[in-house]
Amino acid sequence: MRKRILLASCLCVLAVTSCTIPDNKGQIWNIGVPDSSTVELALGPDRYKDFLANDFGFEDRYFLVGKSDVKKSFPYVLPGPADQWGGTWSTAGLRTHDVNILFGLENIPEEGEWSLIVDLADNSPHKPPLLKVLINNSQEEKIQLTSGGSDASITGDMSQAKPIHLSIPVKKGVLREGGNSITLSVLEGSWLLFDHVGLQGPSRVRLVNPEKAFVRSVEAADYEVATDSGNKQPLLVDVEHLEGQPALAVELDGKEIFSTVLDTARYCLEVPMPAVASSQISTFEVRADGKLLQKGKVERKPQPLQTFARYVDTRIGTAHSRWMIAPGPWMPFGMVKLSPDNQNAGWQAGYQPTFESVGCFSHIHEWTMGGLGMMPTNGPLQTIVGDETDPDSGYRSRIDKLTEEAPLGYYKVDLTDYGIRAELTATTHCGFQRYTFPSDKDSARVLVDLHIPAEYDYQLEDVEIKKVSDTRIEGY
């Protein structure tokens, strides 16, 4: 059942250069120098307490290969939720941080292997971090590091450090022409120190040279919007402004259909393509001040009409929050508020998005009120929910985060320890849950837990449950 990768410490040995442009040996890009030192990275080698003051760790902060300055934009340290200096505190909740790397590829050869290289100078010896690597929101790896060398490493004394070299194969089809992203996060434990991060791949690959704007992604929307000139299927253009005020233009099949002036920050543009009655392939080009940023092909086909409600993701705002703030299919003023729970009891109990497990799905999420948890399981019977930091404890299950969906009125996730898909929805007075069990595992069951971890503890003074039939139970 354990999905983590346990790595022994080893000395980092890499025969690569320190430049940020591709060479003829398959090194596509590098951040830092693989020399077991942190001095060339931002805040290195000892200013870890300035991490928050320099706005590192937030989801909108990034390092853009070919544009960003490694000494200013890539921190030498990444705190974990166990680090007070990283923002975690008893009254502030857990704080997790990300390091985001953006890069553009002009071409993807049909043949050739890719590897992401992460060289760590050291990590916490007392609370080893659980490192998560996410590539283009489609491939994720979780790596449980072993105990590091010394607490002194974070202050620049590397005499007892234990460097670690990670080589992560990138699956075929994950990288794409145009914009790509890699996110490095610490989900559990304490700090780690970066030495070098790089991408290896076919030597024929060409990097995008970012100037005034960088296109993260371009894709056709799975919906249509109504306009005065008829329905449109948006072409979703995700672009970062870099400098100046470039004029962005989008062409479809050789005709300009959209233009705007970029000013600051990130734009997620809905470029209106005329809706079609049947599937067809079109070509697009995205330009900034006339310079081609990205081109490609897009499939256009009939889609359902979009509503404002479909833009909602109920997970937004749930991090570091309280019991009554959670994702799920909640009706306005509903008596039933179904949601996944994954935390221990306490004021933060309920849902924390960085805990990639589920303890149960419970029905009540109001201030000072909670209860009635349900959980589909199979295999050996467990009767306690288990601990938030140990997904192997109790009946809780790890989840596949990439399968999680939380629009208005619906929640879905795959419980990977059991091979079960869970789906939730609700009316004002009733919750509905659908569990899809695998056919190759025995002892399938649905647990009903009346005393689950919640914001405050509570006593069950009077409980009655009776079996009405093979498919129905009733009680209070």
PLM regions: where:
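Short, aromatic- and glycine-rich surface loops/edge beta-strands on solvent-exposed regions
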Residues: 181-184, 250, 279-290
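Accessory carbohydrate-recognition regions in carbohydrate-active enzymes
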Residues: 264-270, 275-286, 296-476
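Short edge beta-strand/loop segments characteristic of extracellular beta-sandwich folds
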Residues: 104, 117-121, 233-241, 434-436
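Bacterial Sec-dependent signal peptides at the C-terminal "C-region" and cleavage site
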Residues: 1, 8, 12-25
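Beta-strand-rich ligand-recognition modules
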Residues: 23-111, 119-206, 253-276
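Short proline/glycine-enriched turn/loop motifs at strand-loop junctions of beta-rich domains
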Residues: 126, 240-246, 440-441
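Short, compositionally biased P/S/T/A/G/V-rich stretches that sit at domain boundaries
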Residues: 198-230
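Beta-strand-rich binding/interaction modules
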Residues: 244-253, 431
